[in-house]
């Protein structure tokens, strides 16, 4: 009998085990679509980014003009640039929903998968940050100056570290060159980490909305979830293309249409929308080192999620108190995002400080307490 190539060929076998014959829970909802959507975002960003890199010049005198040239003179250059810029926003929308799903359904109990996921988030944030500097507009330049300057808060080695990162005594040509190199490199690091993320996921199998073992009721990934993912692809690409065609600058900062000028500071320096929640936490502490530590903690706190799980139930599906806290946390992050976009004045300062405190209080104190209380109430 002829061998089935799909199941016996060394390389096809890996693809088959990951995308075709993979046993998947029969009841995973649309919240489980975001992993594949993130994969699609990554592929889209790498393709559009590669096409943009062919026309971009990493030089302070030419960067801004090269981006303008791309949009004016390159075939469909305007579309490629708009897809790439807005693709980053979709990437972050998907990753935040993906993380929210993980917290709600207790997926963080797959510790290796979760920890690699947090490292992926950090790498994605680094990639987006260095990428935002490349067009060399006003917000690119001042954003780079402000954020890299935060490293100077590190005791003893801070200033040396910043000058080493800049390649000089201010953000200038060497900074732009190395940021371009990093922006080209990091997406491939993300691809590698994604493969590790999937390898660990396929060791344990996916979690499901009930948070119970699903070994007794598995279905093949193909055709059930391939078609389900395909629907997600169509919907997300439709939204991305609509945004890129109808309102490409909706999420950008008008300040970035002005070429970088070290002598003129913009009235309000702020990052792209997807960093605003962390930026609000940074600003809410009136001390440089304290702010930097809070900024780092706002993301690194995710590493603690598996350690803070006190409930006997994995998922929040049957835990109403934890659900209330979860949606309060979501509202809290939205408030932080809004505060981060506002100037540093009353009442935004105090709102930001309260929201920052609540953010850490919910994750570090209230989630474990509520879970322990629910154990008691449910007599578990």
From Swiss-Prot:
UniProt topology in membrane: Multi-pass membrane protein
Subunit-level organization: The cytochrome bc1 complex contains 11 subunits: 3 respiratory subunits (MT-CYB, CYC1 and UQCRFS1), 2 core proteins (UQCRC1 and UQCRC2) and 6 low-molecular weight proteins (UQCRH/QCR6, UQCRB/QCR7, UQCRQ/QCR8, UQCR10/QCR9, UQCR11/QCR10 and a cleavage product of UQCRFS1). This cytochrome bc1 complex then forms a dimer.
Family: Belongs to the cytochrome b family.
Position of the signal peptide: none
Pfam families associated with the record: Cytochrom_B_C, Cytochrome_B
Residue stretches spanning the membrane: 34-54, 78-99, 114-134, 179-199, 227-247, 289-309, 321-341, 348-368
A GO biological process held by the record: mitochondrial electron transport, ubiquinol to cytochrome c
Protein name in the entry: Cytochrome b
One term of GO molecular function: metal ion binding
Residues noted as binding heme b b566 in the record, renumbered to the chain: 98, 197
Function: Component of the ubiquinol-cytochrome c reductase complex (complex III or cytochrome b-c1 complex) that is part of the mitochondrial respiratory chain. The b-c1 complex mediates electron transfer from ubiquinol to cytochrome c. Contributes to the generation of a proton gradient across the mitochondrial membrane that is then used for ATP synthesis.
Coiled coil segments of this chain: none
SUPFAM superfamilies: a domain/subunit of cytochrome bc1 complex (Ubiquinol-cytochrome c reductase) (SSF81648), Transmembrane di-heme cytochromes (SSF81342)
Binding site for a ubiquinone: 202
Compartments in which it is found: Mitochondrion inner membrane
Cofactor binding comment, as recorded: Binds 2 heme b groups non-covalently.
Record PANTHER family: CYTOCHROME B (PTHR19271:SF16)
Domain of life per record: Eukaryota
Further remark: Heme 1 (or BL or b562) is low-potential and absorbs at about 562 nm, and heme 2 (or BH or b566) is high-potential and absorbs at about 566 nm.
One GO term describing the cellular component: respiratory chain complex III
Binding site for heme b b562: 84, 183
Organism: Passerina cyanea
Entry keywords, A to Z: Electron transport, Heme, Iron, Membrane, Metal-binding, Mitochondrion, Mitochondrion inner membrane, Respiratory chain, Transmembrane, Transmembrane helix, Transport, Ubiquinone
InterPro entries recorded: Cyt_b/b6_C, Cyt_b/b6_C_sf, Cyt_b/b6_N, Cytb/b6-like_sf, Cytochrome_b, Cytochrome_b_C_euk/bac, Cytochrome_b_N_euk/bac, Di-haem_cyt_TM
